Amino acid sequence: MDLIYFLIDFILHIDVHLAELVAEYGVWVYAILFLILFCETGLVVTPFLPGDSLLFVAGALASLETNDLNVHMMVVLMLIAAIVGDAVNYTIGRLFGEKLFSNPNSKIFRRSYLDKTHQFYEKHGGKTIILARFVPIVRTFAPFVAGMGHMSYRHFAAYNVIGALLWVLLFTYAGYFFGTIPMVQDNLKLLIVGIIVVSILPGVIEIIRHKRAAARAAK
């Protein structure tokens, strides 16, 4: 339970925690950001990590004159982390996907996460790799499911790079350009919660629609 509380606190107060990391570790924070983003996109056991808000807050911190963070270097590193992470995730899904999710009672490899991602694939096809970048949890499982389904790696790689570019550039530079606005600085926590809600909302709506459609079909 302590870990759950820590994660919730870290996500909701990511601006404070990230600022503390920058103050304590300086340029080493690049490596920390790289690792967090790689784990969220590359490991199916860490779908809870806050990719969207992390990118936005990192961009906002880079805009402050009190920090030595270079937003352009940060973007390059985050792009590499996102692209390599998805590629690793795809490979894991291709090699071990069925085995990892063979236990229906698993607390870590939950079948519901795969079902949610499959719904996206049914509607959007290969473009799911791009769109999933903006939907937490689905973002982590989309490349994994692509690997399980033996999607052509050439097609996957193209979607992977496009999705990473859109996602990293949008959130990081949005934080960088809006982070200096006093109103944004004063309401950063509220904005982070808003980013999380907006990110999750499309997935929730899609699940509700799918369940209603299934209920109508059952009748």
Curated annotation (Swiss-Prot):
Transmembrane annotation, as ranges: 25-45, 73-93, 161-181, 188-208
Topological domain ranges for the Periplasmic compartment: 46-72, 182-187
Compartment(s) where it occurs, according to its Swiss-Prot or TrEMBL record: Cell inner membrane
Protein name listed in UniProt: Protein DedA
Membrane topology: Multi-pass membrane protein
Residue ranges, Cytoplasmic side: 1-24, 94-160, 209-219
Keywords attached to this entry: Cell inner membrane, Cell membrane, Membrane, Transmembrane, Transmembrane helix
Gene Ontology cellular component list: plasma membrane
